Amino acid sequence: MYKILFKNRINLLFLLISFLCLINVVGIDNVSFKSTEWLYIGAGESSQHQLGWHFFKNDIWRFPLGSNPNYGDEFSNSIVFADAIPILALFFKSLKSFIPGSFQYFSFWYFICFFLQLFFSFKIIKKFTGSDLYSVIGSFFFLISPIFLYRVDEHVALASQWLLLFALYLGLTQKIDKAKLLWILLIILSSLINLYFTAMIVTAYSLLRIFNLKFEKESFYKFIKDFFIMTLLLFLTLYVVGYFEIRVADSLSAAFGKYKLLEVA
């Protein structure tokens, strides 16, 4: 009973710290879902995120689901290229009849990132120390690490570094062949947040599976089958969310639009 109560207290502490961090980053007046002005101030990319979400929310449903053709110029676009947290964009668009016209979810995402950064770092440290106290103290260092703080308030999707901590926790605590479903779910989840994290997590998962194949004598057939399933599910997710809406030829063409400012007859 004591352990359960103590763990609940730790989670409550993490929630409180996460909320205080959120206030420090966005300000108490900007915590509300209705507050959007702060996203257009500063040198970060928050205005890009909010504009992408605004166009996406006010458009009809299309397929792929992440299609956002009204955001951009002269070629189709997708919510993923606005770095607007596709998983939340899709969720809140499905609720657009119930949310106000001026609406943002980025402060909520910061709160989630702060909490999960603390939560998973606590779990990892606890694995090695066995001490709740040391783990709580150690988790604070993950919260104030420069590589994390540098992304906060600059690139909201890249503040989701808890995804990497989750992957590290899985690698440390679960046998890779027994936790493959969790790994695949994590890979799919990361692709709905930012593809950079997907690349890193897929690399970690692949190395662990190769290690398991070589030293644990895992079946090669099972190895290939699992990777085929993972790849199929990942590419299906990428397609549905709209990662392939911009053609490679369009994105790489030289002198796009011939530098034009105005349409010339």
Annotated model-derived regions:
Residues 198-232:
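Perimembrane helix-loop-helix junctions
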Residues 1-33, 222-231:
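Start-transfer (signal-anchor) and selected internal transmembrane alpha helices
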Residues 27-29, 201-203, 237:
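Short hydrophobic alpha-helical segments that form membrane-spanning helices or hydrophobic packing faces
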Residues 23-28, 128, 170-176, 207-217, ...:
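Structural signal for the C-terminal ends of transmembrane alpha-helices
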Residues 231, 235-265:
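Periplasmic/ER-lumenal interhelical loops and adjacent helix-loop junctions
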Residues 19-117, 145-159:
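Membrane-interface coil-to-helix junctions
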Residues 91, 95, 121, 125, ...:
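Alpha-helical membrane-inserting segments
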Residues 111, 115-124, 133-174, 179-211:
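Membrane-embedded helix bundles of polyisoprenyl
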